């Protein structure tokens, strides 16, 4: 017999109670024959979930909630098995109350979370911190040092350094090494740099050496003229000799 798919009416519930009292809560097919439009399965579920006088309709206690959570961790969503540990509770009752507990805990967690900082805000803040660290790391790599100086920065003769570089005494390195704090003693270990300007040493070396030699010759000539300029002229007032034209140095 086809069952009608609708809510149970109060008259049907009263008829079901009378039939269960007459036939007992076992022979559901015989009971369904007395209820037009209801199947044996529908009668059984209606009885055990709603009409059975043994059903415990009291609210779940804290002890029952703890037992329900522990049973669910063991048996999962097997509600009919879990209901056996709760006399007077139906499988629908334990299932519905488990969902009530989960919803309540979710509301409690949402209250503890700071306002305006949900999951997306946390991920965004973490991403910003990660990007800052990456940028800082790139900045440190970009500031790796430059030329192989065998002396301290405070005593650099820039012209002499450039001259030694062009004559081959100082060379460039194309590799970079991140700076480690406290690992480099600038007074003992040379520093490194990039050849950003890409100087053409073959075309400029002779010009610079020639200019250097010219500067050195001018310095020598200047030094030779200084003693003569500093000489004090001597006048022979007594006409002793031809010293009037000579200076006293």
Curated annotation (Swiss-Prot):
Read off the SUPFAM superfamilies from this record: Homeodomain-like
Gene induction = By abscisic acid. Accumulates in response to salt. Triggered by MYB46 and MYB83 in the regulation of secondary cell wall biosynthesis.
List the GO cellular component terms: nucleus
Q: Knockout consequence? A: Secondary cell wall (SCW) defects including severe reduction in SCW thickening in both interfascicular fibers and xylary fibers of inflorescence stems. Hyperlignified SCW in interfascicular fibers and xylary fibers.
Q: Which SMART domains match?
A: SANT
Expression by tissue: Expressed in stamen. Present in roots and siliques, and, at low levels, in leaves and flowers. Expressed in stems, especially in fibers and, at lower levels, in xylems.
GO biological-process terms attached to the record: cell wall organization; negative regulation of secondary cell wall biogenesis; plant-type secondary cell wall biogenesis; positive regulation of secondary cell wall biogenesis; regulation of secondary cell wall biogenesis; response to abscisic acid; response to salt; response to water deprivation
Among CDD domains, the record links this protein to: SANT
Annotated compartments: Nucleus
Q: Which GO terms describe its molecular function?
A: DNA-binding transcription factor activity; transcription cis-regulatory region binding
Keywords of this entry = Cell wall biogenesis/degradation, DNA-binding, Nucleus, Repeat, Stress response, Transcription, Transcription regulation
Q: Which domain of life is it from?
A: Eukaryota
**HTH myb-type domain mapped to chain residues:** 1-55, 56-106
**InterPro entries found in the cross-reference section:** Homeodomain-like_sf (IPR009057), Myb_dom (IPR017930), MYB_TF (IPR050560), SANT/Myb (IPR001005)
**From the UniProt annotation, which stretches of this protein bind DNA?**
28-51, 79-102
A Pfam family matched in the record: Myb_DNA-bind_6
State what this protein does.
Answer: Transcription factor that confers sensitivity to abscisic acid (ABA) and salt, but tolerance to drought. Regulates secondary cell wall (SCW) biosynthesis, especially in interfascicular and xylary fibers.
Q: What's the protein name?
A: Transcription factor MYB52
């Amino acid at each position: 017999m086809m069952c009608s798919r609708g809510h149970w009416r109060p008259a049907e519930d009263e008829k079901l109670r009378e039939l269960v009292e007459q036939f007992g809560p076992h022979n559901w097919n015989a009971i369904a024959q007395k209820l037009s439009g209801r199947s044996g399965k529908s009668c059984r579920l209606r009885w055990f979930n709603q009409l059975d006088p043994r059903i415990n309709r009291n609210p779940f206690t804290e002890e029952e909630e703890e037992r329900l959570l522990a049973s669910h961790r063991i048996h999962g969503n097997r509600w009919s098995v879990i209901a056996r540990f709760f006399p007077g509770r139906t499988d629908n009752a334990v299932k519905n109350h488990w969902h009530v507990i989960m919803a309540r805990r979710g509301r409690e967690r949402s209250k503890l979370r700071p306002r305006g900082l949900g999951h997306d805000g946390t991920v965004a803040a973490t991403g910003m911190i990660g990007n800052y660290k990456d940028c800082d790391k790139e900045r440190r790599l970009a500031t790796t040092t430059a030329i192989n100086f065998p002396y301290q920065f405070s005593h650099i003769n820039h012209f002499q350094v450039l001259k030694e570089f062009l004559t081959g005494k100082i060379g460039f390195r194309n590799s970079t090494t991140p700076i480690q704090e406290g690992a480099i003693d600038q007074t003992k270990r040379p520093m490194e740099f990039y050849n950003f300007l890409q100087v053409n040493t073959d075309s400029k070396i002779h010009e610079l050496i020639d200019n250097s030699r010219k500067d050195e010759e001018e310095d020598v000539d200047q030094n030779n003229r200084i003693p003569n300029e500093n000489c004090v002229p001597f006048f022979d007032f007594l006409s002793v000799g031809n010293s009037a034209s000579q200076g006293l140095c």
